[in-house]
Amino acid sequence: MKKAERQRLIKQLIMQQEIETQDELITRLEEIGVRATQATVSRDIREMSIVKTHGADGRVKYAIFSQAQGTSSEEKLRESVKDSVVRMERVQFIVILHTEMGNADVVSNFLDEVAYPEVAGTVAGADTIIVITRSEEDAEHFIERIENMIF
């Protein structure tokens, strides 16, 4: 199956059902005749900007990150930071962003797209982003940017 078709089906499943884990998504895909590995589904989730969010019942589920056509990278970053970042801390010239579980890679991708001059690079895990800035002053400036997005 082609990637575009698989991603279309993933989007359809996530919009129609409350899917909580990658394993559950893989199972749902198999039920409709689509075989995909965990690595493939993980890549699709990242590429499609799928994030984990809290449903009305408080349970965590996958959702398509809202991206209006033509929305700038800065606006996408602002929305993802506001929705996902739960706290941050600075260690000298490194800023650590803590996100909702499963959302760090999406926020990190948007940070990379925006390419702030004070940011040398980012590394993302499941719920943590390490942002390496060029100096302690740049780290403070970056924190101010993020705080302005949240508040």
UniProtKB/Swiss-Prot annotation:
Role played: Regulates arginine biosynthesis genes.
What are the leading ranks of the lineage? Bacteria, Bacillati, Bacillota, Bacilli, Lactobacillales
Which species is this UniProt entry from?
Enterococcus faecalis (strain ATCC 700802 / V583)
The text of the family note is: Belongs to the ArgR family.
Per UniProt, what is the name of the gene that codes for the protein in this document?
Answer: argR
Gene Ontology MF terms in the entry: arginine binding; DNA binding; DNA-binding transcription factor activity
Where is the protein found, in the record's own terms? Cytoplasm
Biological or metabolic pathway of the protein: Amino-acid biosynthesis; L-arginine biosynthesis [regulation]
Could you tell me which InterPro entries the record lists for this protein? Answer: Arg_repress, Arg_repress_C, Arg_repress_C_sf, Arg_repress_DNA-bd, WH-like_DNA-bd_sf, WH_DNA-bd_sf
Protein name per UniProt = Arginine repressor
List UniProt keywords, sorted A-Z: Amino-acid biosynthesis, Arginine biosynthesis, Cytoplasm, DNA-binding, Repressor, Transcription, Transcription regulation
What HAMAP family does this protein map onto? Arg_repressor
GO cellular component annotations of the record: cytoplasm
**Superkingdom of source:** Bacteria
Q: Which SUPFAM superfamilies match?
A: C-terminal domain of arginine repressor, Winged helix' DNA-binding domain
List the PANTHER family.
ARGININE REPRESSOR
Q: What is its main location?
A: cytoplasm
**GO process annotations (BP):** L-arginine biosynthetic process; protein complex oligomerization; regulation of arginine biosynthetic process
